[in-house]
Amino acid sequence: MAASRGPPLLGFRALALALLLAILLLLGCSAAAAYAGAEGVLRQVVGRRGDDGGGGNFFEPFNVTYDHRAVLIGGKRRMLVSAGLHYPRATPEMWPSLIAKCKEGGADVIETYVFWNGHEPAKGQYYFEERFDLVKFAKLVAAEGLFLFLRIGPYACAEWNFGGFPVWLRDIPGIEFRTDNEPFKAEMQTFVTKIVTLMKEEKLYSWQGGPIILQQIENEYGNIQGNYGQAGKRYMQWAAQMAIGLDTGIPWVMCRQTDAPEEIIDTCNAFYCDGFKPNSYNKPTIWTEDWDGWYADWGGALPHRPAEDSAFAVARFYQRGGSLQNYYMYFGGTNFARTAGGPLQITSYDYDAPIDEYGILRQPKWGHLKDLHTAIKLCEPALIAVDGSPQYIKLGSMQEAHVYSTGEVHTNGSMAGNAQICSAFLANIDEHKYASVWIFGKSYSLPPWSVSILPDCENVAFNTARIGAQTSVFTVESGSPSRSSRHKPSILSLTSGGPYLSSTWWTSKETIGTWGGNNFAVQGILEHLNVTKDISDYLWYTTRVNISDADVAFWSSKGVLPSLTIDKIRDVARVFVNGKLAGSQVGHWVSLKQPIQLVEGLNELTLLSEIVGLQNYGAFLEKDGAGFRGQVTLTGLSDGDVDLTNSLWTYQVGLKGEFSMIYAPEKQGCAGWSRMQKDSVQPFTWYKTMFSTPKGTDPVAIDLGSMGKGQAWVNGHLIGRYWSLVAPESGCSSSCYYPGAYNERKCQSNCGMPTQNWYHIPREWLKESDNLLVLFEETGGDPSLISLEAHYAKTVCSRISENYYPPLSAWSHLSSGRASVNAATPELRLQCDDGHVISEITFASYGTPSGGCLNFSKGNCHASSTLDLVTEACVGNTKCAISVSNDVFGDPCRGVLKDLAVEAKCSPPSTTKEPRGEM
């Protein structure tokens, strides 16, 4: 389990002081001023208050304001990097490690939404425990020395169920969401006030010594405001004034709100925001959502945004005047239970983020962006010193430079020996061609679609297109199962499901249609959510249809079958006739036409409506609903069609096993379990088995690719929905050319495979052994092929040229605040995950190696000593750094530019696997 990392109190205080001195030096302070400022408002006070809420402050109280250039922390402009991390998409035990990895990656701020439906599941009943313990999360952020950006909303979107709105909200008489509607405004104000009051009570605002420096009201309302006319405008203005009236003492923002009032900072959400400017000169340029990836839908390919393009977008933002940028997401996490949004969004919210769904660093994205953040921080004294616009120099038809300095810079001459603070960004926005540009008395080569950062207006510290970070290959990869579930087995194999799972499975059949005393009958088709109140994905509709002998004879003579049609369904509809599944339809408000086999006499017709995440985006969410719309008709009878819409329908909410809680360890006696036999696959079946936990502390993943669709519980915890829906064969390419504007369909992967096979099981939900796994399976599958794995980087690799930049650690700030670099050779760095060591070097070559990670090969030029030298430096260590130089390896081929390529294997301390238990 993750634990909060911290040195002893005295050492930590010294570290805090050192960090403060570095910050003040970045701001251009003298050494004397830095020491004087050490007792000022920016000092972090450590050890006085932990996450148990004890007395004292995390920081010396400080004010947060802003000017046209930046957010001001304690009166000082800051260039801030923010990391999006939604607390309910991880477990509390994961939070300390995740926050620490955000900080290590260069983040100053943690950003999160506040999820209304998680905190107020029933009207007036509040919940702030477990994954929804917002106060604990905020205190952990502060304990790590980071700031918090709290996006209260309370509309979140976030690909979260119903956009974060509680479903009970739609039942309030006369309510209309997100417009000038009194019932809605009253509930919104009550909840926002609740959150603000709680934050004040816990002393979490900056002026109280807490971490919160920014807040958001509403969310992307400008995208839909036009749908509401003048009522939308009035609502937006009301929301702003309501927020300001809460007297939080820190700035409020509204994203994608070009008409935001003067007192509110309007901000940008997009893949690129370098061209964005707020609606007033008095406001700083803030990027609230930098989409560094994208979400996935069931049956879709997996989005991927290359690290080079993500870095390019961020560098351009700061180059052109940006001051605070937030990665959406830096850690995406998991839509546990039924929190995934709709329509049809998957359980994983990995988002191709720098930290993956399980909390492991995604390399090279995390490392490349960390290097970018370091380079930007080296430029911070220059960036904050410019009050107006930087110097702009046109370097070519598609090349440009922005120069930030404390005085006028003559860009035609060398900056060597110049004492003033100066940093420059050189951009090549050509998508295809390299460019050689002349500035500062020398030539610089710019790859296509890239930015070079020169913290001293002379030396390049970083280029967005040249990756120096390692690449990691995981034991569990998204979209890499050995089985495709397009063709389900018709016979169960009853073979071993892996080294941790029991080979014994038990089954229990789910009742089709009505099963309990809480069912009711009414004429007509009722709207799904009006009946279920979203306490279950499932709603049964059952009626009876009388079929005459004339109908049967008619079908026999024509060689046809009657069909059931429904005008519109969402998300999944299943049709049962006399207890047997006849067919299904999947889609968002699509029509259904299902041929069915009816017999003479009374036939029981049962429809099952299934929700796969409530709509999370758009106008008029309260009207979107679920279930069926329009007419339900039986066609193809001898006397014509029969309209069943207004028939007497019996309604049953949920599954019998679900409401009997047969997934809970203490409720195993509530179902009639029988040992699974080698038999035909049956839909609507519950399965259970026992399993042991993989040794160590690595995250745990379960492969459900052999199953169809359903839900999975571990020790009573609903890990989420699963569905082995296959993505189309087309839409992915074998290689990804990142230059050029990115969108979510560019560089997709996983075509022709199930969108999600692997599912996260948090370790804190597990015991060492005798863990209970329960599945509800709707369509049929083979549970004996389910497997369990520990998730970690099994292979790390890197390739660095001898002409790469010096390591960023060679840079520092002089007392004047000017950036300076010491002469240093490039370095190749490798690092395994926490608790793992480099166990073997599987490839190493200094010379002219070819290929990439997992595909390296030696070239004609190769230093024979490479493998031995790299092995000596790295094996047995968690991380290592090797100078890329002839001084280390000798010169195997004079006059030839050489690279060092290394591939290494990472291993946990112990790879011994627990024997699986039997039930």
From Swiss-Prot:
Highest taxon listed in the record's lineage: Eukaryota
Cellular-component GO terms for this entry? apoplast; plant-type cell wall; vacuole
Please classify the protein's predominant subcellular localization into one broad category. secreted
Broadest EC class assigned to this enzyme: hydrolase
Q: Which UniProt keywords apply?
A: Apoplast, Glycoprotein, Glycosidase, Hydrolase, Secreted, Signal
Q: Which residues are glycosylated?
A: 63, 412, 530, 546, 855
- Residues of the active site are 220, 289
Query: So what does this thing catalyse?
Result: Hydrolysis of terminal non-reducing beta-D-galactose residues in beta-D-galactosides
Q: Which CDD domains match?
A: Gal_Rha_Lectin_BGal (cd22842)
Among Gene3D superfamilies, the record links this protein to: 2.60.120.740, Galactose-binding domain-like, Glycosidases
Q: List its EC numbers.
A: 3.2.1.23
Protein name (Swiss-Prot/TrEMBL): Beta-galactosidase 15
Q: Which source organism does the UniProt entry give?
A: Oryza sativa subsp. japonica (Rice)
